[in-house]
Amino acid sequence: MKILVDLINYPKAGGASYDWRFAIIIGLCRELERRGHTFEACYHRMKERPFPTYTAGVFDYYIALSPYGFQSRRDRYNKYRKAGKPVTCYDHGWLPKSLVVDQKRLFGDSYYYHTIRDRIQECPSPEAAEPIRQKLLKGNLSKRTQTRKDKIPNVRYIFIPGQVLYDASIVNYSKTGLKGLMTQTIRFAKQHGLHVVYKPHPGLDGSDQCSAQTLKALQDRMEEKHENFHIVNTSIYDLMERAEFTACVNSGSIIDNIVSQTPVYCCGKSFFAKSGTVIYDPNVEQGLTTMLNKDYDNESMKKQQLRMLWWLDKYMVQEHQPIEKQIELWTMHSGVTL
């Protein structure tokens, strides 16, 4: 099989010392190459070239670094879809050092979007996820490294995890952006005698990217302007556990709510929207009101969160897995026999 693959090696995106997306994908590609498959690659933020660079050939299979981002990437994705070729998307997974792999798109267009609530019922019992949960909590292990330890204000607050300002999950799946969510949540909190605690996105810490600088300026202005808005950089689990609830657009930190068994509201259409693990409402005022009034079944949400954690741990492609297991899971998610 002739395979075209998007490769990226950008550690800052994960807030880590290396990019585990590249570590996992290059291992898979090398094994498939050993089995007789051939590769060309499109490179993103990379100087090294482990495979011949993509020109304009015809391929049997396209492994895409998400169908979003640069126009050339979107055009390539659409080209191979239109041609009836199998296309698999991948990006950072929700668990530490993992990949999300999907035969359609990501977020609210995932292959699993409409069926995930039923799929996670495979979990034998919610308690089956407890060993996984405790390991993550005790090790303070999140999708991204948790290093800072700012003091958390002794107030009642709504927690907002930072996201990339123009992230694909926001631009493509929410009518309300991060700035809009922050503004509306600050106003809502003031009306109800609450504060807002905001944790900056760890992948943007120290970044000189224009979007990162724009976001830093925005959050600094909000802290200066609103006395009930606090920027706090510490363990995301601690921030979630002490909050009244979490409010986000469509954040990868939803998995941290799942691990910490805490309620989360999303105004963007996420992978988790129909799973029973989150409250999804594109109307921010309405969603915040639902959360504050606790107009949902919290015990049911917690059980669904545990089932989801079990399912993700069982079926996500993770760096620690043997290569045969990674290929087995990749085949399951992609629908492509390798």
Q: Where is each model-derived feature located?
A:
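Extended catalytic core of nucleotide-activated donor transferases of GT-like folds
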Residues: 22-31, 40-102
